Regions:
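Histidine-centered beta-alpha loop that forms part of the nucleotide-sugar donor binding/catalytic region
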Residues: 21, 66, 115
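Phosphate-coordinating loops and pocket residues in cytosolic domains that bind phosphorylated ligands
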Residues: 28-31, 64, 73, 173, ...
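Charged catalytic carboxylate motif
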Residues: 32-36, 95, 102, 202
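Hydrophobic/aromatic residues within transmembrane alpha-helices
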Residues: 18, 55, 67, 125-127, ...
Length: 204
């Protein structure tokens, strides 16, 4: 079984449990995590022992979004010419899109088990999954608007296939939080469980 720096993987009874494993950083998505998600899901897609994949997060939150240190590293890159720096950013975004598309392309059903906060890049991630479930107290937010960014890694392309377009636009324009009960009402999640333990037991 593969081992990863930012993920934990366990396969039992034909269920692959992939857990985001940066709890001290609220599972913020650093560069290694993006690459490992692609490697992991491409492998699980071809694994004959795996019939379903459950994606969850360790610690208090599912995912706090993209690790902003990634962008600091890009901004501080040695490229000084604006055009070259812009092209480098474009190539980085294309790679990140490919990383998450591996979840969407996985040949096995992927179920997201969400607790705590699911923000920004976390929304990109769960919108790639086939089904989403959450615990009471979970919150969802397309936060990119608050830092002057576009949700350009898949949220705006995938969410309109999951929830109504008008709701997608409202959430993208305002960055407001969606609580668990509203997430169920708008169809973002299939069901809400009492707590994280009940969530994982129910989804498994």
């Amino acid at each position: 079984m593969q081992t990863f720096e930012t993920l934990s993987l366990n396969i039992e009874n034909h269920i692959a449990h992939v857990e985001l494993n940066r709890p001290d950083k609220a599972n913020a998505m650093n560069l290694p995590m993006w690459g490992e998600l692609q490697t992991c899901f491409e492998s699980l897609s071809d694994d004959p022992e795996v019939r379903v994949v459950v994606l969850s997060g360790a610690g208090k939150h599912f995912c706090s979004g993209i690790d902003l240190d990634m962008f600091a590293a890009i901004a501080n890159d040695s490229q000084s010419e604006p055009a070259r720096k812009a092209e480098q950013l474009r190539q980085t975004i294309l790679r990140l899109q490919d990383n998450l598309s591996a979840i969407e392309k996985c040949r096995k059903p992927v179920l997201a088990a969400i607790h705590g906060s699911c923000v920004g890049g976390g929304i990109d991630m769960v919108s790639c999954c086939d089904m989403r479930y959450c615990a009471q107290g979970s919150t969802f937010s397309i936060k990119e608007i608050d830092i002057g960014m576009t949700a350009d890694v898949g949220t705006l392309q995938r969410l309109p296939h999951i929830i109504p377009q008008g709701v997608v636009r409202e959430l993208a324009y305002t960055g407001r939080n969606v609580e668990a009960s509203e997430a169920r009402d708008i169809g973002l999640v299939n069901a809400v469980y009492e707590n994280r333990e009940a969530l994982l037991e129910g989804v498994m």
